[in-house]
Amino acid sequence: MAHLQRTFPTEMSKGRASFPKGFLFGTASSSYQYEGAVNEGARGQSVWDHFSNRFPHRISDSSDGNVAVDFYHRYKEDIKRMKDINMDSFRLSIAWPRVLPYGKRDRGVSEEGIKFYNDVIDELLANEITPLVTIFHWDIPQDLEDEYGGFLSEQIIDDFRDYASLCFERFGDRVSLWCTMNEPWVYSVAGYDTGRKAPGRCSKYVNGASVAGMSGYEAYIVSHNMLLAHAEAVEVFRKCDHIKNGQIGIAHNPLWYEPYDPSDPDDVEGCNRAMDFMLGWHQHPTACGDYPETMKKSVGDRLPSFTPEQSKKLIGSCDYVGINYYSSLFVKSIKHVDPTQPTWRTDQGVDWMKTNIDGKQIAKQGGSEWSFTYPTGLRNILKYVKKTYGNPPILITENGYGEVAEQSQSLYMYNPSIDTERLEYIEGHIHAIHQAIHEDGVRVEGYYVWSLLDNFEWNSGYGVRYGLYYIDYKDGLRRYPKMSALWLKEFLRFDQEDDSSTSKKEEKKESYGKQLLHSVQDSQFVHSIKDSGALPAVLGSLFVVSATVGTSLFFKGANN
């Protein structure tokens, strides 16, 4: 039976009320990972449609986002789920080819695509959920990729500005929170340096099967153009009078780094370089108008430069800093690299390490090889941003825990709805944010879990699950709430302070447990073990555990 061995920290015992007034709690998504319906509504083809269909072997399960989790047809029921678990914000992205099928505004706007996003936004607002809209989450129209190489060309800057302008015009009367770019580091490095993600470009010395690309060069060009496109979009945004109290920024995805050998000055300095190359690469220009000095020194003339006018547009172009945080690693300084085979990784002169010099991991390993549950890393990043960039407003635009397919993690191996590891991960990171706000003075203003639903996870396909809701891909994409969803529902209740009596707490706990039990009784996992004779024990333990967990208790782990 599960062993309950931890209570909430006292300072978080009031749940949502422990955070500043107006603090946003939400979930995050992206168009290609959620929507499906790739051939509906006059949608054009994106680079990810092309990549997943042309190179299925680069997706772990050879899948694609053609259907994804069918948010296109099910958004109303999914928004009800957000409301049910007391979320007050939702981060979604616009699919560029859904509103501009041919990439350029002068080639035609899809009014069907515009209507879809208008309907989603209106449904969110009707449920008192604040939309945070991302303009670019990697699904550039394939037409622009074919025509001039997408973000490899400066031509993309004008086309992105026109696309962003369309979004502001059509949705800005109801949307005040915007994000221009999601994880430009991933898009540049994975798309143009390692070739793992669309469009899959890199040098032959990185991947012998590569069709085209130039590692150590193209990623810097792509990121440069992304930053210039961002600046142009922000200039348009700030001239839109109908956008009231608007805020716009970029969602970065830094890791936190600790030195492989704390006694080695090179490893300590390597951590600083690694932060410059991952976070500073795209954050520094928007705050200071130029790339970090470490990058300019290391990359040399392969790193593009900004004109004075471009720098002026970039400085102050973010109203908040978006942070997508998942994990932390150790960094070991590299003494020598081959200058004839440059990559982004060798340019920073470090290796990422899963263990330190003593063979110890930075924290408990999560659901993938490079994932570690280390909330302290998030707190350190928040303090780093405050110290380095003058304490700007911060949104945690993504944070989540992925588990590989149907991996078993405890006694509850028969049912993934008992996601104790995810629950622990989320609670730990919310606590780290709380500490950063109240003890460190960091201006964190929102937290978005990745993600509401299991979904298409890029190169991992459907083999990694991050959702608060389990998607049954074998049974019509049915949704089942996991323990983490019900825990968040309880944590985010608006009536925390008015519901403190013992009888009401016990009533809530019992209801909480029954909800989870009901959500999984008819799932494929329960059906699959009926013949094993283990069903009564599994469901019995499930009920006992879930009925016991309320606002004051949560799972630390499950032990026999």
Swiss-Prot record:
Belongs to the glycosyl hydrolase 1 family. It comes from Arabidopsis thaliana (Mouse-ear cress). One of its GO terms (cellular component) is peroxisome. The active site is at 183 (proton donor), 398 (nucleophile). PANTHER family: BETA-GLUCOSIDASE 26, PEROXISOMAL (PTHR10353:SF226), GLYCOSYL HYDROLASE (PTHR10353). Its EC number is 3.2.1.21. GO terms for molecular function: beta-glucosidase activity; thioglucosidase activity. This is Beta-glucosidase 26, peroxisomal. InterPro entries: Glyco_hydro_1, Glyco_hydro_1_N_CS, Glycoside_hydrolase_SF. The keyword rRNA-binding does not apply. One of its GO terms (biological process) is indole glucosinolate catabolic process. Possesses beta-glucosidase activity toward 4-methyl-umbelliferyl-beta-D-glucoside in vitro. Possesses myrosinase activity toward indol-3-yl-methylglucosinolate (I3M) and 4-methoxy-indol-3-yl-methylglucosinolate (4MO-I3M) in vivo. Component of an inducible preinvasion resistance mechanism that prevents penetration of the nonhost fungal species B.graminis and E.pisi. Involved in indole glucosinolate (IGS) activation during pattern-triggered immunity (PTI). Functions as a myrosinase for the breakdown of flg22-triggered IGS. It is found in: Peroxisome. A beta-D-glucoside binds at residues 33, 137, 182-183, 326, 398, 450, 457-458, 466. PROSITE patterns: GLYCOSYL_HYDROL_F1_2. It catalyses: Hydrolysis of terminal, non-reducing beta-D-glucosyl residues with release of beta-D-glucose. Optimum pH is 6.0. Keywords: Glycosidase, Hydrolase, Peroxisome, Plant defense. It holds the Pfam family Glyco_hydro_1.
